């Protein structure tokens, strides 16, 4: 397959916001270059997962190799490295951009520039990529190509005199795009003589061959049967199978600098072949790895419990299998007095959490309850020890801790001007710190806030969408930890603390959250034979309380008239029974109560 010189190889990716037509554009390119036969074509060809096709988002990266005969009569090899467009997967995006020399910036001609487009463009510029702007969906009745072109020049700072106007759905402008990739994207550096260095930009688990690693050769050459070393995990493997993605796997004997392919080497788990790691030869290793590798760190944690306790082992197997494919997922066993056995799982962000939960329910037929998502807090104890805590129940007592720090993020919201007020109001209620506001055009604004991550993980995104009728888009990045006035809010039902309902909140909000929780639980916990107190407490101080009245039998029904002392005796006897029942009775907190707490409007 190495019949084409390096000068005729082009590696590029497509940058676009969700729904701007990236997958459709990739489909048309595969069709026009006859990479995929007409009869095999289906929509969103590169999105393999059922969930991706349904939500119309790209979760796992895909790659495809296309052969294209340009107008100059030469045959070129175009390697498309697809990227996920969502903020949770920005590390994966940065790695796949590092494997390219150019990028197509696809913008919807009716929507304009969105927040995630912007974030990914900056990543591409950091990697020194050549950016080719493309206006997509120009066939739509609401398309405003001139306004959007001006916006791209204004916001992104690209020269758009030769912007390509295309409609992936109608197949317009596809040849212009292919031609401009050949003309504008620089070829890879010709470094075949140097020691092997290749960048892993994706990997997935195949039950028969082990982990399949997608990589781009940066320097040198790799052959089937070579012994290779992964520089971050320090493990060595022998390559059993080497090939290119066209887009189905086609085996080859060797790949040289500039090419994109895959290999299998009986690797047991995706954790051993992390995205961003460098592959080098075990015999003549390269002196230094490629820059930019970091471990994917989970940012959001929550408990996953099976509704049926018998499914615990199934849940463990399912998580083990998902983990083979998803190195960013972490989990450890957890027990809760209210929910039984389950797992504490860590995710990159909220979308990642939702996708994992949905895949567990859909692919493994599990019925799950999730506890409220929490973030990683940093606690300094009075002894000077620093602890990282992702579960409110691990928080030390107030007298033992010196300070609690929480992660802060910078949120960029791009919105039509009419919604600026409501978005600023939302950010202020979430303890946001206003940083900056820029006007792109008369009608579009970029608002920048700094917010605690904990305020964003619950329902910030849903609120943003509903307040702006879906027009606003957001993008966030972590900016570090800051000290906060944080307390642990415990919920006591019948004087017993329910660990799954505990949460870490800001002191100023504790009363309102506690009050709302108590009222919500009063509605949801069924009445028992005895009176149940529901209390919200910080340490030993009760800050809010509600009571669920007892169900009681009318013991006076059989007394007609007669002496008052007779009635008193019966009532006192009943009260005594209720008192005894209360001391030994247990209260069942239904699952709806846990779910409702997640949806408490902060």
Swiss-Prot record:
Gene3D superfamilies membership: 3.30.70.240, Elongation factor 4, C-terminal domain (3.30.70.2570), Elongation Factor G (Translational Gtpase), domain 3 (3.30.70.870), P-loop containing nucleotide triphosphate hydrolases (3.40.50.300), Translation factors (2.40.30.10)
UniProt keyword annotations, A-Z: Cell inner membrane, Cell membrane, GTP-binding, Hydrolase, Membrane, Nucleotide-binding, Protein biosynthesis
Molecular function via GO: GTP binding; GTPase activity; ribosome binding
Subcellular localization: Cell inner membrane
Disulfide bonds: none
Domain tr-type G positions: 7-189
SUPFAM superfamilies noted in UniProt: EF-G C-terminal domain-like (SSF54980), P-loop containing nucleoside triphosphate hydrolases (SSF52540)
UniProt EC number: 3.6.5.n1
Membrane association type: Peripheral membrane protein
Keyword Cell membrane found: yes
Residue spans crossing the bilayer: none
InterPro entries xref list: EF-4 (IPR006297), EFG_III/V (IPR035647), EFG_V-like (IPR000640), EFTu-like_2 (IPR004161), G_TR_CS (IPR031157), GUFP (IPR027518), LepA_C_sf (IPR038363), LepA_CTD (IPR013842)
One cellular component (GO) term of this entry: plasma membrane
GO biological process, alphabetically ordered: positive regulation of translation; translation
Biological role: Required for accurate and efficient protein synthesis under certain stress conditions. May act as a fidelity factor of the translation reaction, by catalyzing a one-codon backward translocation of tRNAs on improperly translocated ribosomes. Back-translocation proceeds from a post-translocation (POST) complex to a pre-translocation (PRE) complex, thus giving elongation factor G a second chance to translocate the tRNAs correctly. Binds to ribosomes in a GTP-dependent manner.
PANTHER family for this protein: TRANSLATION FACTOR GUF1 HOMOLOG, CHLOROPLASTIC, TRANSLATION FACTOR GUF1-RELATED
Record's protein name: Elongation factor 4
Organism for this UniProt entry: Picosynechococcus sp. (strain ATCC 27264 / PCC 7002 / PR-6) (Agmenellum quadruplicatum)
Lineage: Bacteria, Bacillati, Cyanobacteriota, Cyanophyceae, Oscillatoriophycideae
